[in-house]
Curated annotation (Swiss-Prot):
Residues 719-1184 are annotated as: Required for interaction with VIM. The lineage of its organism: Eukaryota, Metazoa, Chordata, Craniata, Vertebrata. The gene is SCRIB. Ubiquitinated; targeted for UBE3A-dependent multiubiquitination and degraded. CDD domains: PDZ1_Scribble-like, PDZ2_Scribble-like, PDZ3_Scribble-like, PDZ4_Scribble-like. Residues 662-686, 1378-1390 have a biased composition (Acidic residues). This is Protein scribble homolog. Residues 1-809 are annotated as: Sufficient for targeting to adherens junction and to inhibit cell proliferation. Residues 708-1219 are annotated as: Interaction with ARHGEF7. Residues 548-557, 960-969, 1396-1408 have a biased composition (Low complexity).
């Protein structure tokens, strides 16, 4: 493409060439042309193997990039680069650096990393200008002894080498700032290392160092020191001399203590001492006043120093996996602490002073021995509080209790206490192998294992509850947490004692000291005796006390168990179960442990109080006042013995939520093995009538949860007196009448800034106060400058009257705020043994809500919607502080997406929770730089849902309205499958299975395709849906039995057969413990197989592909198919040699990368990036025998309308894999030789010979249909897209002689019936077709950015004209034809040559067939449509109005009239241009006339029988007097180019297309041609047969040269 013009003449002064990632195997030849000017050459990431000798003639190079190639030798000629400053040859195969490198004296930056170097040349140290040297991973065994000669070295990287020692001359590098020696074999550091005065970073990790030299303390400017992964046993005391040190990394060493001198590191910010042997931390650590991160993980610490309280800037403290028994109370002094992790220690209590760390958000105390939590923790705004390894959610709901020992109020929940009594710890720690898992995994792996559970034959009750073959271990499942809670409740009772023989291993093994060899954390070890997994507590002693050698029960006993088996469940009651004294009610003679409640028939149940649903997020945000606790005790303990449910049914007026009992107590709605019951005794309900004392802000729900009323805003008026100082008042104000409101819509005067030390701050003025009066001057309704003047003229003493809003928290309240209140209290579902089908639940009160996800791409004008509400702003709805969509701009991104509606609640923005967010926070997220915004929205079910059409989906089975349950306001899940609907699904032709995927936090290992709004090809072509398109080989989905091609019917009960693609993705990604998929085993696509093709070195793959998403359909049999298909297989490539790939196959995957849903360009890039081995997954595509060859061959399309109006040409989606070409170039590369592209033939063939000519063409195998207006089904709905479509599709050409008739498959018309010009054109076509080499290659002389700016400018002008025309259209002012050539009732006789393409831009006014007058007025359009109806009814289908809305119809009319107006203005402008040109030249040549002028003014040849108006125009133009007067001298084009001219209207949408049309026009007359104000004069001699040579051209267009093979210069009749 670039050889059509001589580049060497255009620009030989090129300074920079970037050829990175171009798959080059040799240096391009054109680079050598720039040897005099080239300074920067980047050839990184190619396949270069050698550097030729001409390469080293680029003497002016200053920057050379050759990294990531296959260069095997660096020639000595590199010395020619005397001016080279930067050299990068990293990641090659260079074995040695030539000695001549020393002549590159200007070299400052050199990177030789990743080469198999073993040494450096001797002269390398002569590069004294070298400042940055990288020698990473080069197998270097020693440094040159004179490396100190590199005196200017600033950065030296020697990582991943084999260095065992360092030369002493290293100390001469006085400018060295960064030294990286990590990953070597250093055992001793030289003392001279401390003599580097400017060293800032020293990396010594992953070496064999056992000690550090004391001289390191002399590095006064050292900022970062990394000595991790060594063998250090102690640190030198001189380390305290590193006064500027900020990062000290000591991980994975053998340190037993830290030196006291560490306290001198005042600037230390990060200290990591994890995986050492520290027994204590020095108290001097408290002197590191800037310490922000302290990592002490995996040591032997038993206590933390008290001086930690001095670290006021500490934000992260991690002391996991130590032996801490107590936490110092001084830790409350860490005011900035936000993350405190104390996992797997031996803590029994937490200090109450921990509540002073106001910024603490994450507290991890899992794996300890805590009995309860201090009540003061309610002061903290915790986001996560971890009490167990398998805790499902970061926050829990707590209840208050009195500590039995201290009498203090504490917080507890179902995860507390964490450990059994101390008497049982040893048995838990020393459990025998028979009690543990036989095949315990080495780390925490989510595995389901089946155990043979031994039982005693004489334990009938245990046998009934011990049918527990399926055991769940090391998975975060709430069932074990509930049983732990049950065990804890039993241990609290004093009436029950344990037999010494009965052993209960601890749930968490505690004495696991992590060493460097083991690396196993305490939470990763399997629990040997976890009282969990749904196993009854009473049977634990017997079950775990038995050895594995005992016999299993026989089959008869198992049958009895199956009959009497009942799921162990957690029962609920309104009363707290009070344990009786010892010996009264629950202890047998043998002292065996029995359940403290009767078996399932009993009424009393285990109470679970303040234990939340595992899906809820709760945080403790407010400490209750003592009065509230008194109210709780009085209202909930009528008997004075313990908390009870007296307030269970008394919901105060301030109850934020009051769900049913079964909703409140719901624990896990996704468990298979539990069936929960709710038993509420009638007497409990009667007792619940007793109400608690009415205390402000306090009420109780069914489970005695302490509830509060929400915080409210109170307003108060203050009067403050301020004494002005020399610096002023120290305040700034904002707002005022006529100014931007400071808060909401309030135009008052507000305090916007208060200086901390100013007099206003000392007087009590705060930011946000509203200023009402200053020294008696009322400021209500005042403008901003008036308030400023009032403050300035107030004198020394200023008396202000302020209005202040303050947030008032309710008194006596414990606020347990759900982070997502809409997820509260889902109705409980019961499950059967087979497929889990939810039962119908009573409808909840309140509006039904549904959620959906919207993903918006930011446009130039933003997102196109507005929000309202949020904290700190006026509520959108009364009493609701959420954020809502308040307005959607018409035509914006949100309006085009169609997924947003006014009134939608915004729950999250890009994953950030917005339920409790401030308005300005939401605005900042929406206005961030991210190009896409993902919104989670909630909408009341009464409103319309986002559109999700199903074009091919069969309707679902009709079910009764009562069989579908819609999500209630508090329920998180959307629609649920009903039994009848599922039963109808099971009657299909393929089996249906239910697959359970445990969610352990990792990926699912599958990809899906399809949905109601997406194509699902090649799956379910007859019945679209959601299908699994890819399964990772060892992923979770593959292990669970899912296969490619499985149809997903439901996800966790949600029917997704009619869901959109995004809804299906959201359902799969919804957080849950277990993902239950209902899949139908549809067969895989026919012919699916995996092929492996090996490419020889340098061999091409040899295939071309077509198709792709958002492009031209690659399947000619299905225009909706967006798959990737093979369109050509070259016999010389690897694919042709293999023989298994053929034309028509569909490509599904390439080297494990899915091609489904990829665009054409993405698929081509993926195929080009494969190496020598190609593993491709294919299936059957389309049958090439049933498709016309023109449709199969790449780059050719038989009918431009066959693939839809929106797709302009198949060239856009056909690419060869073996070379980088533009889509146009790809098409030209693969088209057989021919004179023109297919649409060019259409424009040139005379209308009467369409059928016959096209049958003889090289590309067509059938009769070519002339283009016709598209059907309404294929028209785009967007008006602008319609204009682009019609501009891109070739229309009838204005130079055709006669109106086109409907095509007939008959033979060609006889020559006698043709006019002379038609026979002449036919002769030209026949003569030139075999001689043409192909379509001329074109080079765009206008850059893409310039073209885009020109189009935007034209569109802007067009928009202004459209608005003006809209106004004129309303007044009926468009009745006058502005062209001046003909009145309205007459058609213009001389249309310009460009009028035809311009008219094609309007769908409603296509160009008249046969070259009639152009349509530029409404009357002309009506006449043209009438003529079309008479002549060609099948071609006169207009754009139906019913397909367009009134707004779109008005826009269409305005656009059309604007184009007409532009065409008329263009005609006037060109006439004026011609007149100026003629007048400027007529003065000079009146007396002298050349032979060309006389010949041009001679009478024209005899006209043809029916000349067209265009031909008449040409004849009149050639014979007009004075127009062609030529002087004797050459025509000055610079004068002509300076004349004003504008681009034709037809180039507004597709300039290249219009240009190509002009290049293909046959000449209407053998005289002068005028195009766009360009004069093209030709010699009127008889040409030789063939094409006109360039030597016959005297004057050519100033826009482009006349090239050989151009149409329009035909033989002249005599």
């Amino acid at each position: 493409m670039l050889k059509c013009i001589p580049l060497w003449r255009c620009n030989r002064h090129v300074e920079s060439v970037d050829k990175r990632h171009c798959s080059l195997q040799a240096v391009p030849e054109e680079i050598y042309r720039y040897s005099r000017s080239l300074e920067e050459l980047l050839l990184d990431a190619n396949q270069l193997r050698e550097l030729p000798k001409p390469f080293f003639r680029l003497l002016n190079l200053r920057k050379l990039g050759l990294s990531d190639n296959e260069i095997q030798r660096l020639p000595p000629e590199v010395a020619n680069f005397m001016q080279l400053v930067e050299l990068d040859v990293s990641r090659n195969d260079i074995p040695e650096i030539p000695e001549s490198i020393k002549f590159c004296k200007a070299l400052e930056i050199a990177d030789f990393s990743g080469n198999p170097l073993s040494r450096l040349p001797e002269g390398f140290t002569q590069l004294r200008s070298l400042a940055h040297l990288a020698l990473n991973d080069v197998s270097l065994q020693a440094l040159p002894g004179d490396v100190g000669n590199l005196a200017n070295l600033v950065t030296l990287e020697l990582r991943e080498n084999l260095l065992k020692s360092l030369p002493s001359s290293l100390s001469f590098l006085v400018k060295l700032e960064q030294l990286d020696l990590g990953g070597n074999e250093l055992e001793v550091l030289p003392d001279t290392l401390g003599a580097l005065p400017n060293l800032r970073e020293l990396w010594l990790d992953r070496n064999q160092l056992s000690a550090l030299p004391p001289e390191l303390g002399n590095l006064r400017r050292l900022v970062c020191l990394d000595v991790s992964e060594n063998r250090l046993e102690e640190l030198p005391a001189e380390l305290g001399g590193l006064l500027l040190l900020t990062d000290l990394l000591l991980s994975q060493n053998l340190l037993q203590r830290l030196p006291d001198g560490i306290g001198q590191l005042k600037q230390l910010s990060i200290l990591k001492v994890d995986q050492n042997r520290l027994c204590e931390v020095t108290e001097a650590i408290g002197d590191c006043e800037n310490l922000s991160e302290l990592i002490l993980t995996e040591n032997l610490l038993t206590a933390l120093p008290r001086s930690l309280g001095k670290l006021t800037k500490l934000t992260n403290l991690n002391a996991d996996r130590n032996r801490l028994e107590v936490l110092p109370p001084e830790i409350g002094g860490c005011a900035a602490l936000s993350v405190l992790s104390l996992r797997d220690n031996r803590l029994a209590t937490l200090p109450a002073e921990l509540a002073h760390t106001a910024e603490l958000h994450v507290l991890d105390v899992a794996g300890n021995r805590l009995q309860s939590l201090p009540f003061a923790l309610t002061h903290l705004n915790l986001k996560a509080l971890w009490l167990a390894e398998n805790q499902a959610q970061p926050m829990l709901r707590f209840q208050t209790e009195d500590d039995a020992q201290t009498g203090e109020k504490v917080l507890t929940c179902y995860l507390l206490p964490q450990q059994p009594p101390p008497s049982l710890e040893e048995s838990g720690l020393q459990s025998s192998p028979s009690e543990s898992w036989s095949d315990a995994p080495p780390s925490r792996v989510s595995v389901i294992q089946f155990l043979e559970v031994p039982m005693c034959s004489d334990d009938a009750e245990g046998a009934a509850a011990e049918k527990r073959g399926l055991q769940r271990r090391a998975t975060p499942h709430p069932s074990e947490l509930k049983v732990m809670k049950r065990g804890v409740e039993e241990r609290r009772g004093e009436a029950y004692s344990w037999k010494p023989e009965s052993r209960l291993p601890s749930p968490l093994e505690e004495d696991k000291r992590l060493s460097t060899e083991s690396g196993l954390s305490e939470d990763s070890q399997p629990s040997t005796g976890t009282a969990s997994q749904g196993e009854p507590e009473g049977s634990l002693a017997d079950t775990q006390g038995l050895s594995q050698q005992e016999a299993a029960p026989n089959a008869q006993e198992e049958a009895v168990e199956e009959e009497t088996y009942e799921e162990p469940t957690v029962r609920f009651a309104e009363d707290t179960l009070l344990l009786p004294p010892a010996g009264e009610d629950g202890e047998s003679e043998e002292g065996q442990l029995e359940a403290p409640w009767p078996l399932p028939g009993g009424r009393q149940r285990l109470i679970r109080k303040d234990t939340p649903h595992y899906k809820k997020h709760f945080k403790i945000s407010k400490l209750p006042q003592p009065e509230a606790v008194v109210a709780l005790l009085q209202g909930a303990q009528p008997d004075g013995e313990g908390p009870a449910g007296a307030g269970g049914w008394h919901n105060g007026p301030h109850t934020p939520w009051a769900p049913r009992a079964e909703e409140e107590d719901e624990e896990d709605e996704e468990e298979d093995e539990e069936e929960e019951e709710v038993a509420v005794a009638e007497e409990d309900k009667e007792e619940a009538v007793v109400s608690a004392p009415s205390i402000k802000g306090v009420s109780f729900d069914q489970a005695n949860n302490l509830l509060i009323e929400p915080a409210r805003i109170e307003e108060e008026e203050l009067t403050l007196t301020i004494v002005r100082q020399t610096g002023g008042l120290g305040i700034s104000i904002a707002g005022g009448k006529g100014s931007t409101p400071y808060k909401g819509d309030d135009e008052g005067i507000f305090i916007s800034r208060v200086s901390e030390e100013g007099p206003a701050a000392q007087a009590g003025v705060r930011v946000g106060d509203k200023l009402l009066e200053v020294n008696g001057v009322a400021l209500h309704g005042a403008e901003h400058h008036q308030a400023v003047e009032a403050l300035r003229g107030a004198g020394t003493t200023v008396q202000m009257r302020l209005w202040r809003e303050r947030m008032v928290e309710p008194e006596n309240a414990v606020t347990v705020t759900p982070l997502r209140p809409e997820d509260d209290y889902s109705p409980r579902e019961r499950r059967g043994a087979g497929l889990r089908l939810p039962l119908l639940q009573p409808e909840a009160a309140g509006p039904l809500r549904q959620r959906h996800v919207a993903c918006l791409v930011r446009s130039e004008k933003g997102l196109g919607f507005s929000i309202a509400g949020g904290k700190g702003s006026t509520p959108y709805r009364a009493g609701d502080g959420g954020i809502f969509i308040s307005r959607i701009a018409e035509g914006g991104a949100a309006h085009r997406a169609g997924t947003l509606q006014v009134g939608d609640r915004v729950l999250s923005i890009n994953g950030v929770d917005m339920t409790e967010a401030r308005h300005d926070h939401a605005v900042s997220l929406l206005t961030a730089a991210s190009p896409t915004i993902a919104l989670l929205l909630e909408r009341e079910a009464g409103g319309p849902l986002p559109p999700s059409p199903l074009p091919h989906s069969p309707p679902p089975p009709v079910t009764a309205p009562s069989t579908v349950v819609t999500a209630s306001p508090g329920e998180s899940g959307p629609l649920r499958l009903a039994p009848s609907l599922l039963a109808a699904t099971l009657e299909g032709p393929y089996p249906v299975e239910e697959i359970c995927l445990p969610r352990a936090g990792g990926p699912l290992g599958l990809s899906i395709v399809g949905g109601s709004d997406h194509s699902s090809h090649p799956f379910g072509i007859q019945e679209p849906g959601v299908f699994i398109s890819k399964v990772l080989p060892r992923g979770l989905a593959a292990r669970s039995g899912l296969r490619v091609g499985d149809r997903i019917l439901a996800v966790n009960g949600q029917d997704i057969r009619e869901a959109t693609h995004q809804e299906a993705v959201s359902a799969l990604l919804r957080p849950c413990l277990e993902l239950v998929l209902l899949v139908r085993r549809d067969p895989p696509p026919p012919g699916m197989r995996e092929l492996c093709i090996q490419k020889a070195p340098g061999e091409k793959l040899g295939i071309s592909v077509r198709g792709g998403a958002k492009g031209h359909a690659g399947n000619p049999c299905d225009p909706t198919d967006e798959g990737i298909f093979i369109s050509k297989v070259s016999p010389t490539g690897a694919a042709g040699r293999d023989g298994r790939l053929r034309v028509g196959l569909r490509l599904l995957e390439v080297n494990q990368q899915s091609l489904l849903g990829l665009t054409h360009g993405e698929a081509v890039q993926l195929l080009r990036s494969v190496g020598d081995t190609l593993t491709v997954l294919v299936c059957d595509g389309f049958d090439t025998s049933t498709v016309a060859p023109a449709e199969v061959s790449p780059g050719v399309i038989a009918n431009p309308f066959a693939a839809g109006v929106g797709r302009r040409n198949s060239l856009e989606s056909v690419s060869s894999i073996d070379r980088e070409l533009s889509p146009e170039g790809c098409g030209k590369e693969k088209e057989p030789p021919g004179p023109t592209p297919q649409w060019g033939l259409e424009a040139m063939v005379p209308p009467g010979t369409t059928g016959g000519k096209m049958a003889e063409g090289p590309h067509s195998s059938s009769c070519q249909q002339p283009p016709s207006p598209p059907s309404p089904d294929t028209l785009p709905t967007n008006v602008k897209q319609a204009y682009r479509t019609f501009a891109a599709v070739p229309g009838p050409h204005p130079l055709q002689d006669t109106p086109a008739q409907p095509p007939t498959p008959g033979p060609m018309a006889s020559p006698e019936q043709l006019s002379f010009r038609e026979r002449q054109k036919y002769f030209e076509l026949e003569v030139r077709m075999p001689q043409a080499e192909g379509p001329p290659k074109r080079v765009s002389l206008v850059g893409a950015d310039d073209l885009r700016k020109m189009q935007e400018e034209e569109a802007r002008k067009l928009q202004q004209k459209r608005a003006q025309l809209m106004r004129e259209a309303e007044d009926g002012a468009l009745s006058l034809d502005l062209d001046g050539e003909a009145p309205d009732d007459e058609e213009p006789e001389e249309p310009p040559p460009w009028a035809g393409p311009a008219a094609g831009l309007s769908p409603s006014s296509p160009q008249p067939l046969g070259g009639g007058a152009p349509v530029r007025t409404a009357k002309a359009e009506r006449r043209h449509q009438e003529r079309l109806r008479v002549q060609s009814p099948e071609l006169s289908t207009p754009l139906p109005d019913r397909a367009l809305s009134p707004a779109e119809r008005r826009a269409l009319e305005a656009e059309k009239r604007a184009l007409w107006r532009a065409a008329r203005m263009k005609s006037l402008e060109q006439d004026a241009l011609r007149a100026q040109m003629v007048l400027s030249k007529s003065q000079e040549g009146r007396s002298r006339r050349g032979p060309l002028e006389r010949l041009a003014e001679a009478p024209s040849p005899a006209p043809t029988p029916s000349p067209t108006p265009v031909e008449d125009l040409g004849l009149q133009t050639s014979t007009s007097p004075g127009r062609l007067a030529l002087s004797g001298r050459k025509f000055d084009y610079r004068v002509f180019a300076a004349l004003p001219s504008s681009r034709p209207v037809c180039e507004l949408q597709s300039p290249d297309f219009a240009e190509e049309l002009r290049s293909l026009e046959p000449s209407p007359s053998p005289g002068l041609q005028e195009e766009d104000g360009e004069v093209a004069m030709v010699l009127l001699g008889r040409p030789s047969p063939g094409t006109v040579g360039p030597e016959e051209v005297t004057l050519c267009s100033s826009r482009r040269p006349v090239r050989p093979g151009r149409r329009g210069l035909g033989p002249v009749p005599s």
